[in-house]
Swiss-Prot record:
Gene it is expressed from: adk
Record carries keyword NADP: no
GO biological process: AMP salvage; nucleoside diphosphate metabolic process; nucleoside monophosphate metabolic process
Domain comment in the entry: Consists of three domains, a large central CORE domain and two small peripheral domains, NMPbind and LID, which undergo movements during catalysis. The LID domain closes over the site of phosphoryl transfer upon ATP binding. Assembling and dissambling the active center during each catalytic cycle provides an effective means to prevent ATP hydrolysis.
Catalysis: reaction(s): AMP + ATP = 2 ADP
Cytoplasm is among the record's keywords: yes
The protein, known as: Adenylate kinase
Naturally occurring in which organism (per UniProt): Pseudomonas aeruginosa (strain ATCC 15692 / DSM 22644 / CIP 104116 / JCM 14847 / LMG 12228 / 1C / PRS 101 / PAO1)
Region (NMP): 30-59
Protein family according to the UniProt entry: Belongs to the adenylate kinase family.
InterPro entries: Adenyl_kin_sub, Adenylat/UMP-CMP_kin, Adenylat_kinase_CS, Adenylate_kinase_lid-dom, P-loop_NTPase
Tree of life domain: Bacteria
Residues at which ATP binds: G10, A11, G12, K13, G14, T15, R123, V132, Y133, G201
């Protein structure tokens, strides 16, 4: 079971990734974790990565693909893997295909932009305890105050509407074209199978749809 999970920030990918990896006994592979592990291991590739990162550069697709090919030969990938946050661009998707890395399923968690903005921009946090509220879906008893201490709740910078909209526009320009790429590939070659799952409803309902698509 080799899976690529796509979806905008705030679409609920992290939650679904956890269910998929537990259900199928496969690791979740994120490029960030992989790059950090390579640097820590000090392998020749890792040293290359460290050089690029230390100089503030972006790690090239060639290096990332080489790391992925290395990573998926490890024992925990015997039953497959789930790519999280990769590929992000068409050149990365093409490089993955050219490298002979086969993918069984591409799952897109599709959620309307306005729904994502409402989900994220409505979050309020109590900094001291980490308690999270939502102005609509899980409001505090007194608006703007923590239920336990009565202290002020804050909105994190990352959760502000303009930040969320900026991240969504980056997603649409960079990653959304991957949806078309994999839809066309699926239609032409029959693999990977492409599934668009509506990421609305309860977590359980979305998980049921995702697992049914993968089974």
């Amino acid at each position: 079971m080799r899976v690529i999970l796509l979806g905008a920030p705030g679409a609920g990918k992290g939650t679904q990734a956890r269910f998929i990896t537990e259900k199928f006994g496969i690791p979740q592979i994120s490029t960030g974790d992989m790059l950090r592990a390579a640097v820590k291991a000090g392998s020749p590739l890792g040293q290359q990565v460290k050089g690029v990162m230390d100089s503030g550069g972006l790690v090239s697709d060639d290096i990332i693909i080489a790391l992925i090919k290395e990573r998926i030969t490890e024992a925990d990938c015997a039953k497959g893997f789930l790519f999280d946050g990769f590929p992000r661009t068409i050149p990365q998707a093409e490089a993955l295909k050219d490298a002979g890395v086969t993918i069984d399923h591409v799952v897109e968690i599709a959620v309307d932009d306005e729904e994502i903005v409402s989900r994220i921009a409505g979050r309020r946090v109590h900094p001291a305890s980490g308690r999270v509220y939502h102005t609509e879906h899980n409001p505090p008893k007194v608006a703007g105050k923590d239920d336990v201490t009565g202290e002020e709740l804050i909105q994190r910078e990352d959760d502000k509407e303009e930040t969320v909209r900026h991240r969504l526009s980056v997603y649409h320009s960079q990653t959304k074209p991957l949806v078309d790429f994999y839809q066309k590939l699926s239609a032409a070659e029959g693999t990977p199978k492409y599934h668009s799952i509506a990421g609305v409803g309860s977590v359980e309902q979305i998980t049921a749809k995702v697992l049914s698509a993968l089974s």
